[in-house]
Regions:
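Short Pro-Gly-centered flexible turn/kink motifs
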Residues: 38, 187-205
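Extended, loop-rich substrate-binding clefts of extracytoplasmic carbohydrate-active enzymes
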Residues: 1-31
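Beta-strand-rich interaction surfaces with strong enrichment in secreted/lumenal proteins
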Residues: 24-26, 184-189
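Active-site/ligand-binding surface loops and adjacent short beta/alpha elements
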Residues: 47, 60-140
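Short, acidic/polar linear motifs in exposed loop/turn regions
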Residues: 44-45, 205
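Asparagine-centered strand-capping/turn motif at beta-strand->loop junctions
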Residues: 38-44
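Histidine-centered catalytic micro-motifs
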Residues: 51-59
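Acidic/His-leaning functional-site neighborhoods
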Residues: 105-182
């Protein structure tokens, strides 16, 4: 499945993002994986800042079945009361419930947090079902957002869902870069330039004895 989104001068979206550009997305389904590829093209005459993020939803199983998350991040971004990153990085060991380097029960988490995963794999373990869901990214995806919507308002809908979002930059990267944060992950494309990358969601059978 392929799709393309374009912004041109005069478009409504151009008022919010004043660069002529295009985003192509390709979804490639195989026997045990879904690959999501992007291609961004700057069709403008000026350099264009941008970032890419994927926002998949995952349901918590019913009953006693658990989903465990392993996220290889040593640091996360401090946030304002509005949950926007300040640009300050903190060790995950300084905040309870933020060190996810070992498999952790998702239902026990309460997060809307940007972690620095630096292109490393993130894993969801469905031990009762006998498999892992491994999220692999190209090196441009520097961050992962964990959002436990099931205890942040969404529980009123009757759905118990959470997100693990792969992002090439931290949330609000354009404003943070304007404020002087040089390593927000924001990418800048020269006129006529292109950038591509992607995320793969891959099912792997769990090895015997792993829980």
């Amino acid at each position: 499945l392929r799709a393309e989104f374009c912004i041109r001068a005069g478009d409504e979206n151009y008022e919010a993002f004043p660069w002529e550009c295009s985003l192509q997305m390709a979804l490639i389904l195989t026997e045990n994986a879904l690959e999501c590829r992007y291609l961004v093209t700057n069709r403008d005459q000026a350099p264009m800042p941008f970032g890419i993020g994927l926002h998949p939803w995952f349901l918590l199983p019913e009953g006693t079945e658990k989903v465990r998350l392993r996220l290889p991040a040593e640091t996360y971004f401090e946030t304002t009361p509005d949950l926007l990153p300040t640009g300050r990085r903190l060790p995950v060991t300084e905040m309870p419930g933020h060190d996810l380097r070992r498999f952790t029960d998702v239902a026990a988490l309460d997060l809307d947090t940007v972690f620095e995963t630096q292109g490393r794999d993130v894993t969801l373990r469905y031990a009762d079902r006998g498999y892992d869901l491994v999220i692999s990214v190209t090196p441009d995806f520097l961050d992962s957002v964990v959002f436990t919507a099931f205890n942040r308002g969404m529980e009123k809908t009757g759905y118990r869902a959470f997100c693990v979002e792969s992002q090439t930059c931290c949330t609000d990267a354009i404003n943070l870069s304007e404020e002087g944060l040089a390593d927000s992950g924001l990418m800048v494309l020269a006129p006529g330039g292109t950038k591509e990358g992607g995320v793969v969601y891959r099912f792997e059978m769990k090895k015997g004895g792993e829980g």
